[in-house]
C-alpha cells in the first residue's frame, strides 16, 4: 500500500538564532516521522545543481574507469547490484544502484580512510521487484539528502505493521531531506525514530547526493541517561561507533 506523505518543513534561515519553537519542530519531526525537510540552509541552489551535475558526470563514465576506483575500506565506487540494503530479500541480486562514497578531506579520519578520486578533469524498462535501494534504515546519526527531483523515495513509518504502508516523499527544490539514522535511535533509546525507507524505480535515472553524519570510530555509543527511566530502561548495549558501522556494511555487502 502506498500513499503520499506530507513531511514537516523546517526553516533555518538564521541558524545562529534557532528559536525554541524551531527546535521543538525538529524534535517533533524526529519523534513522529524520523524525516523532515530543511530549507533556507544557506547552500545556494546553483551549488546544489552543480554537485548533481558532477555526480551524473561521474556515473556516466565507462565502467572500467569507475572500477579503477573500486571501494577500499568502505570508500570508493560500488557497482550495480553490489549492495543489498535489505538482507531479508530472498533474491540473489543486489539493489539496482551505483554508489561512490568519500569521507573527510582532512584530519585523522582522512589519513585513516583515504579517499579515492578520478583523475582531475575526467569527470565530465524496470521489473516491479527491482529496487533502486531496498528497504532499509540508515546506519549513522543524521542523513542529509539532495535529489534531482526524480521521484521514487518512499518511507514506512511503522516497520512492524503488515502489510507495510509506503508513503511517497517528493523532493522540494532548494531543500534537503533530513532523516534520523540507527545510531541516533540507539543514543536516544528509541525516542528518535530511524525510519524504514526505500527507493523504487520510476522508469528513468535518478541521481542523489547524500551526506552521512557519523561519530568518530572510537566514539562510545550508549543510551543517553536523559532518554532512559525505570519504565524505559536502555534498549541497546554500548558499542563503538566504528564497530557498529563496519558490521552494518558487512551485512550489506555479504547478503
What are these regions (language model features)?
Residues 1-255:
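Peripheral, non-catalytic segments flanking oxidoreductase cores
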